[in-house]
Amino acid sequence: MYLAKHFLIGAVVYAFAGTALAQRVELQPAPFVQVPFQVDGNSPVSWKDGQLQFFTSDGTPVKAHGADQFALSQPTRIVVDRSDHLPMWIESVWTDDDGTVYGWYHNEPGGVCPDGKLTAPRIGAAVSYDGGSTFYDLGLVLTSPDPADCSAKNGFFAGGHGDFSVIPDRERAYFYFLFTNYGGDVIGQGIATARMAFEDRKMPSGAVWKYFAGAWAEPGLGGRVTPVFRAETSWQRADTDSFWGPAVHFNTSLESYVVLLNRACCKPGWPQEGIYASLNPDPGNPAGWSEPVRILRDIGWGPGYYPQVIGLGPGETDTEVGEGARLYVHGRSKWELVFTKGDFFISGADQPLDPSAPMPGDRLDQTSTGRRAGR
């Protein structure tokens, strides 16, 4: 897969081209909007009775609603039936045909390290029968096999799995997880993937399988991973260089899955080096993700984490998007992304090309180093 980049006046265009039609992602300026309350982590959305349901968390999950993403109410606290996996961040949701909302959460347990400064996140599942106002915890589904390293210098995590998103495939055969592995040897750190059979969504604990060494055969609870995008520098170091926090959606215009990534590099404090995008027509083929391409560097505010899209078309969400979407970074947006497909030539520039940006390259294979991830 090859990449070409050009710049229009007021827009930045990236084109992903392979044997099929070129796939183009265009970044355009848009009027500034901001979610009118605090957000943290990926903030998923769904629809209920013609109203957009917006979920976010700051350790306690909350939900707002509105006619669309630009008219949100103030949030109300989500009731969770048990407290043993608090604090939690609900980072993905999916609504079944009968209105049942399945959610997946990032949990940061206490007591991981003696001084209490570091934790090791885990990923769990929950279900709601009232549109997301109340969730029933279904238990943990993804945990790390590696012991906590309380000497880690990244400032947050001693290991663990977290900062993730979940999406079903188009055939409703599997739910796919893209998550960040913060622990163990650096060769296994970075963005990893796992999947769960669609029919196991009601009883997910023990039903998720991680991708490792070419097979979906490692258990979600304690199994090993082969990263899709491997960390360049370990999360145990202060100067980590790694992608993190994937936000994935299916793009109906491109007929492809698109993931947005943070990249922490290469100083203490998880500085945001940029926001990256990668495409894959089939999440069941982890080697099919294209080399991540930086689409945004100068965000305009800090720390600039948590990129995600919300589609602009009727009924679109953060996981199903058409030709146009708002790009949010930490709950603020001053950009639209336009996704198109077709044969065309791309050239030109309205700003200097960045020599550190990824160059055109082939599809990643299992042994590729990929590139980066972060918090």
Regions found by a protein language model. Give the residues of each.
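Intrinsically disordered, low-complexity segments enriched in polar/charged small residues
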Residues: G10-A11, V80
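Aromatic sugar-binding surface patches on proteins
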Residues: G159-G160
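Cleavable N-terminal signal peptides
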Residues: I9-G10, A20
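N-terminal signal peptide c-region/cleavage motif recognized by signal peptidases
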Residues: A15-A17
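Conserved beta-strand position repeated once per blade in WD40 beta-propeller domains
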Residues: N42-P44, I90-S92, D163-S165, G245-A247, ...
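Beta-rich carbohydrate-recognition and catalytic domains
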Residues: A22-L86, W94-K153, R170-Y174, F179-T240, ...
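Bacterial N-terminal signal peptides that target proteins for export
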Residues: M1-I9
